[in-house]
A protein has these predicted regions:
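Local beta-strand N-terminus motif with an aromatic residue
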Residues: 5-6, 60, 250-251
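Dinucleotide-binding Rossmann-like beta1-alpha1 core, especially the glycine-rich loop
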Residues: 51-126
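Conserved Rossmann-like nucleotide-cofactor binding loop
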Residues: 16, 40, 260
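Active-site/ligand-binding neighborhood in enzyme catalytic cores
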Residues: 96, 106, 113-238, 246-252, ...
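Glycine-rich FAD pyrophosphate-binding loop
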Residues: 25-49
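C-terminal segments that line or cap access tunnels to active or ligand-binding sites in enzymes
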Residues: 250-252, 259-410, 418-421, 427-430, ...
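N-terminal Rossmann-like FAD-binding beta1-loop-alpha1 element of flavoenzymes
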Residues: 6-34
Length: 450
C-alpha cells in the first residue's frame, strides 16, 4: 500500500467515484467514504422519473464498453436485467434520414450533393491533429461533407467556435471515411453503418441508466454519504469542509467534481493553477423529455440534427430503449423522446420558450407521432455536459494535474479529467478502478495520464 494512506475520501457518487470505492473494497481497503452532494447516485449518468411517470436520463446515454472491468461491474450489478440493442441511428438532413455515419452514406443525399461530397473527399489533403478542429474537418472530409454536416452539427453540439477546439480527441468520436469506401456506398447502393464502439449497446430494463449506479451505491452501504456537498478543501491539512459546516479529514482524495470547481474550492491555490482551471471550457445541455399518448412507432435508436433552425442536436427514441421508460411500461399507449440542446459561454441558453421550441421541432421533423396528445414535457439542466477539447486544454491540465497529485488529490472522471476522449461511462469506471489500484498498490494508471 502507498505509505501513510489510511483514509480515502471520494467526491461524487457517479460512475468513477463508485467504481473507485468498489475497487478499494475489493482490494481490502475499507477506510473510504464517498461524499455526494445530491440525494442519489449517478451523477451525469443519473436518471429521474417525472410526475407523469416517464423516466429520463440526464442525456443520451447508452451502455457500451472498451474494458473488461466495466463489463464485469455491469454483470455483477445488473445481471440479466438489461436489454441489448443494435444501434439504428440517422442524420435528419433536408427532410430525409441519412444512416449514421453521414459521411459513410452519401448515396442518400441525391446525385448532386453526393458528387459534391465525393469530389471534396477525393481532393481533401488529409488532416493533422496538430491543427484546430475546423481545419481538420475540411482537410479530412473536404468542403462538401464539412459544409453539409460536419460543421453545422458540431457547431450545435459544442456551442463553441470550432477554431478554438483541437483535433487530438477524434479517434473514437468521429468516423473518418476514405474515398474508396464512400464511393462504394454510392455506386453499389450499400449502407455503411457499422462504425463505432456503440454499434451495439445495453440499457437497464427499468430505472434508466441511473439504475446501474443506484444499485452499485446500495451495494456499498452507508459509507456512501448523500447530500454532503464539499464547499472547501484544505490541501495542506488534508481537510474537507461541507456546506453544513462540518469537516472531514483524508489522506488521499479522489475527486470527480469538475476540475475547475475543484480548484476553486482549494485553499491557497497558486495563481497559475487557478488561471489554468479558469481557462477550461465546457458546454451545458438542456435536456427536454417529451412524452406522447401514442405508440413509439419506428425502431430507430437516436437521430442527429445539423439544421440550425431546430433547437436540439440529438433526439433519443427513449421508449425503444426500455418499455419501462414510459408509464406502466405501456408502449402501446405512450412514446417518449429525449432531446438535447447545447449552450455555453459562447452561446447562452434561451431564457424561455425552449419546451415549446422543442415540441415544435419534433412536429416539424416528423418525430412526433401524428395527432398525438402531449403526455409530458420535462426539462432538466445539465450545466456540465461536455468538457470542450480547446487548443489550450492540454497545457492547462499539465499545469493543474501534477500540482494536485503532489498533494494527494486525484481528479478523475468525465469532468475530473476534463478529457472528452476518455469521457464515456466505461472510461469513468476504468479511471475509478485504476486510481484505487494506484493508491493501494502503487500501480500505474492505464488510461489517464497528466
Amino acid at each position: 500500500m502507498t505509505s501513510a494512506i489510511e483514509r480515502v475520501a471520494i467526491i461524487g457518487a457517479g460512475p468513477c467515484g463508485l467504481a473507485c470505492a468498489r475497487e478499494l473494497e475489493r482490494l481490502g481497503f475499507a477506510q473510504w467514504r464517498i461524499y455526494e452532494r445530491g440525494a442519489e447516485a449517478g451523477g451525469h449518468a443519473g436518471s429521474v422519473r417525472d410526475p407523469a411517470g416517464f423516466t429520463w436520463d440526464f442525456g443520451g446515454h447508452v451502455v457500451f464498453s472498451h474494458y473488461g472491468e466495466f463489463d464485469a461491474l455491469l454483470d455483477e450489478v445488473m445481471g440479466d436485467d438489461v436489454y441489448e440493442h443494435e444501434r439504428s441511428s440517422f442524420v435528419h438532413f433536408d427532410g430525409a434520414r441519412v444512416p449514421y455515419p453521414f459521411q459513410n452514406n452519401l448515396r442518400y443525399l441525391g446525385p448532386e450533393l453526393a458528387l459534391e461530397c465525393l469530389v471534396g473527399l477525393m481532393e481533401a489533403p488529409g488532416g493533422s491533429p496538430d491543427g484546430d478542429f475546423a481545419a481538420w474537418m475540411e482537410a479530412t472530409f473536404g468542403r462538401g461533407i464539412t459544409r453539409l454536416f460536419m460543421r453545422p452539427y458540431n457547431v450545435k453540439v459544442w456551442a463553441t467556435p470550432l477554431e478554438r477546439m483541437s483535433a487530438t480527441w477524434i479517434a473514437d468520436r468521429v468516423s473518418v471515411v476514405d474515398f474508396r469506401r464512400a464511393l462504394r456506398s454510392v455506386l453499389l447502393a450499400e449502407d455503411d453503418v457499422g462504425w463505432g464502439p456503440n454499434n451495439t449497446f445495453k440499457f437497464p430494463r427499468r430505472g434508466g441508466t441511473g439504475e446501474i449506479y443506484r444499485r452499485l451505491a446500495a451495494s456499498l452501504g452507508e459509507r456512501v454519504r448523500f447530500e454532503r456537498e464539499v464547499t472547501g478543501i484544505d490541501a495542506k491539512q488534508r481537510l474537507l469542509r461541507f456546506a453544513d459546516g462540518s469537516e472531514e479529514g483524508y489522506d488521499a482524495l479522489v475527486s470527480t467534481m469538475p476540475i475547475d470547481r475543484l480548484v476553486a474550492a482549494l485553499d491557497r491555490c497558486p495563481g497559475r493553477v487557478g488561471e489554468a482551471a479558469a481557462s477550461l471550457e465546457h458546454t451545458g445541455v438542456r435536456v427536454v423529455g417529451v412524452g406522447y399518448e401514442a405508440p413509439p412507432g419506428e425502431g430507430w435508436s437516436w437521430m442527429y440534427f445539423p439544421d440550425g433552425s431546430i433547437p436540439f442536436y440529438r433526439v433519443t427514441n427513449f421508449a425503444k430503449y426500455s418499455p419501462e421508460n414510459v408509464p406502466g411500461g405501456d408502449t402501446g399507449t405512450y412514446a417518449s423522446f429525449l432531446t438535447e440542446t447545447s449552450y455555453s459561454s459562447h452561446r447562452p441558453p434561451p431564457e424561455s420558450g425552449l419546451e415549446q421550441a422543442v415540441t415544435d421541432g419534433l412536429a416539424a421533423t416528423g418525430i412526433a407521432p401524428a395527432e398525438a396528445n402531449l403526455a409530458s414535457v420535462h426539462m432538466m439542466d445539465a450545466e456540465y455536459a461536455y468538457p470542450v477539447p480547446t487548443r489550450g486544454r492540454d497545457r492547462a491540465l499539465r499545469t493543474i494535474q501534477p500540482w494536485l497529485v503532489d498533494r494527494g488529490i486525484y481528479s478523475r472522471g468525465r469532468f475530473g479529467s476534463w478529457r472528452y476522449e476518455i469521457g464515456n461511462m466505461d472510461h469513468a469506471v476504468k479511471m475509478g478502478i485504476d486510481v484505487a489500484r494506484r493508491i493501494v498498490e502503487g500501480r500505474a494508471e492505464e488510461i489517464w495520464s497528466p
